[in-house]
């Protein structure tokens, strides 16, 4: 997701990289214009673009939503590309957790030459958020290229990167590439739905050896574009929030709708949910958002840059916080956030409701216990009739992976090759990724895509999801070079 929403601001509508390193990164400049797509592809030899696009199209057009989709089918289709490239059966494996026939995934490996070096893991989820055809302008499960964009569910989150990982494996095999480290690929299901079986978590628990690696690469943050399409910065995931659902529930005896009473379950619930909408959790700073705002202050400049600097000096500076809060991404990076996402109430149109409930999805700031948020939500509800609970806990809480020079330097190197002058900036991701399962399992996991996105974030999880065609092709070049560099460290 793009962090710097220049248009929205204008209209007012993990160990860590040090501050000295940030200064060096930003010394090379604030932003650059788009280079020509042809130039970047020429630099990469433009090998197999049509084949990659076909793989991407096949993946997008395989419905992998939880309700009616089939991740196992998507994994099988991607496995076919690897086998066609010459991978033996023992190096390409479909896994299907018991009781979840359509929630399977893929594990594959290109063996390295140095058995003393641990592997690098390329991780992607292939499941997508639900998409209703009647709500979309275009068919969400048809890859449509229009006006310089790819449209379709999963085009941005995250089938572009999943297709790039598959494409990398095919290219490496066909080139006869002999990496020092083994290169592993894992495509999983269940990342997008908290109540679903998570494939990455399942692998960490049941197939730990198969995905064992020195570190893993996955989604998390993208490159930032402004409203004019100028590159602002390439972000690296330095930390991420934890996604946790809470339930507000009210029950009572109900009754006949002709005899209304003040003690109405819906009224209790609506008032409590409204109080959630008005509450702001306090500003918190850690290494990740400090590094981000330190870097972005120099890029953004002006009133907003000054506000970033002021908040870093004093998180209680109300005026500075108010300035940053006008940008939805910056607002989310500064604190825990909670929002109502689903409502359910009543049992008949002519009866007083016996039950009313709401799902409150919170993105919890790193290091804050779930129980602390539960306690605060109970205080916010401020009504003994409203019971607040945690329906399920998804994944353990673990510290983020350290951004060591071994990880950071190759990213800087490849970014400079492709986009001279664009700074590399660590970021705190307000969302969550499968890193939440791999980091606790002892596999440091980093989010970097090389895909630059618009200020609207490409409408991920929303209607008419899209990503720039050029961004996808450049991300392909970036990740191809980056993985090769890591594999020979």
Which residue ranges define each predicted feature?
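Bacterial N-terminal signal peptides
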Residues: 27-37
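Sec/Tat signal peptide C-region and signal peptidase I cleavage site
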Residues: 38-42
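Acidic/histidine-rich catalytic neighborhood of metal-dependent amide-processing enzymes
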Residues: 149-150, 156-235
